[in-house]
Amino acid sequence: MSALRQKLDALIEQTDLQVNERQREQLLGYVELLNKWNKAYNLTSVRDPQDMLVKHILDSIVVAPHLDGERFIDVGTGPGLPGIPLAIMHPEKTFFLLDSLGKRIRFIKQVLHELKIENVTTVQSRVEEFQPEEKFDGVLSRAFASMTDMVEWCHHLPKTGQGVFLALKGLHPKDEIDQLPEWCSVTEIISLTVPELEGDRHLVILSRKDN
């Protein structure tokens, strides 16, 4: 067993997540591809695959138990975070991964092909210009600088009625919450525990007040 696999198993052991053998292999395969492509494409500032397991894989999959619904979009996905790890954790759900940069979308397509991930659709577009045929149960992001930007640029993406925004944040974002537009309200703030990651992590669930 590789050192990377041992590390992944040890990290998962510190959570309540159920991760089967195929999922573990896909998560490792993703880290290996990210590490390989990163040298040429500069996809992430995290250079060490062991650190990627903590800062990218675990930091994404701890959100998996909180995804209600079937159809999700990860906006500003970058190299596929948190979308690819979440798609691996939820093969029964559908994920759209959106980014405006072609090199990131090319990388994601290669990951989907090599790891045989079949529940992901890639979208190369600016988020405010993307008009989906069908709206989403959840709009995910860990890339946006502020939640106000996120909800204003993505306001057209959640389903009317039950669609939500899911913002992955560090510290409890009280200031950002205070600045949210009138039409948006906080449904829930979930404190996340990521093994071996320093600092706080929170998942903020937002919805339209007229839902």
Curated annotation (Swiss-Prot):
Record keyword Transferase present: yes
Residues bound to S-adenosyl-L-methionine: G76, L81, V127, E128, R142
Top enzyme category: transferase
Reactions catalysed: guanosine(527) in 16S rRNA + S-adenosyl-L-methionine = N(7)-methylguanosine(527) in 16S rRNA + S-adenosyl-L-homocysteine
Molecular-function GO term, any one: rRNA (guanine-N7-)-methyltransferase activity
Enzyme Commission code: 2.1.1.170
Pfam families, per database record: GidB
Highest rank taxon of the organism: Bacteria
Keyword match Cytoplasm: yes
Any one GO cellular component localisation term in the record: cytosol
Keywords (A to Z) from UniProt: Cytoplasm, Methyltransferase, rRNA processing, S-adenosyl-L-methionine, Transferase
Compartments where found: Cytoplasm
InterPro entries per UniProt: rRNA_ssu_MeTfrase_G, SAM-dependent_MTases_sf
Record family assignment: Belongs to the methyltransferase superfamily. RNA methyltransferase RsmG family.
Function recorded in the entry: Specifically methylates the N7 position of guanine in position 527 of 16S rRNA.
Protein name: Ribosomal RNA small subunit methyltransferase G
Organism: Vibrio vulnificus (strain YJ016)
Gene: rsmG
